[in-house]
Amino acid sequence: MSDLLRNITPRQRVGRMGEDAVAMRYAEMGFAVVARNLHVSRNEIDLILQNETHLVFVEVKTRHTAPHTPFRFGRPAAAIDKDKRARMRKAAEDYLREHPTSLQPRIDVAEVYVNRLPDGTENVAEIKLFPAAYAGR
């Protein structure tokens, strides 16, 4: 295990697993990663990706799940309240002020569901993408 991975909490490890899976899913759709875990105006943007037409700011929410088990705390995206949406929008606006672009900006949300297997390992069970999740809100 690399020194970088040795010093993170289990929660951070699962979060990173989710972000990696989402970055790969977007790559399959023709997007390239511009930045990861970027701090802008005291807010963090999980992923910034781009293709020929869009610059996408992605908030990734990762949760453990078991098949056919309801979530104790609701769906992962439900953790993004009004204040979090405002911080995401401000971070995206501040990024665009510092990095002007002709690409169309968009804020997406990704839910990642991770299974904990009997042998103690974990794998990504499902990814749900919500493009333009907060357009006009």
Residue ranges and their predicted role:
Residues 113-137:
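Short, low-complexity, polybasic intrinsically disordered segments
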Residues 9, 13, 17, 42, ...:
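Residues at secondary-structure transition points
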